[in-house]
Amino acid sequence: MQCADLQRVLATLPAPSEYWVAYSAGVDSHALLHLLSQCRDGVSAPLKAVHVNHGLQKDAPTWAAHAQAVCDDLGIELVTLQVSDKPAANQSIEAFARDQRYRLIGDAMPAEAMLLTGQHQDDQAETLMLQLLRGAGVDGLASMPLCREFARGWLARPLLEFSQDAVMDYAKTHQLQWIDDPSNASDAYDRNYLRLQVMPLLKKRWPHAAQTIAKSASLLGEGRHFISAQLSEQLHARVNQRCFSVESFSELDSFA
């Protein structure tokens, strides 16, 4: 995992006004932030980091202070945001934290900016497996796209082609200091259960399981894009500015 790898991925994405790295202070986002800082001269837009205090852990202020210290050391501006709401009694804490995080960051980012997150290949494999267990269709099984529209700009995941081991090797090679969220050690959460209990068993039998599962997600993403393009073409052929034919729509395959 080197600058050339990251620059190659970024070159395939829209050109933003700024790059914002979602920096939790964990190992994945720290590795991404550090890698970007090492090759910032070859990056086409200014670089910032953003840290969200969800207010869910007693040590959250310590994490924010650590994030600030790391960014100061790297010479990167850090934007710190605070979640003020609390999850409802029957609400998933994971979903609450994710929704609040993206809402706050989306509101804070300027137009045409790109949020970069640290999800990697193993995260993609876990996402596909979760979607399978939920009975998802093509949209869900395509899992996490490399880039999508977000707020007034984009959200991209430039580490999706790299394994968890590659990210960890980078962090150890560069002697990065990160914070382990204690909630990641609990298999009470579905994703953690897959990560801690299921994936190790799969990798014991099939060492490249995460890579091949993530590849399936990528292929499903291509299929989703093709279906979307075909559906758009069919809609344009059947709708004009004033009306559309119900009969022509009834001729479409039910999958469309």
Feature locations, PLM:
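ATP/NTP-dependent adenylation/nucleotidyl-transfer catalytic domains that generate, transfer
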Residues: 189-256
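Core alpha/beta nucleotide-donor-binding catalytic domains of modification enzymes
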Residues: 1-196, 200
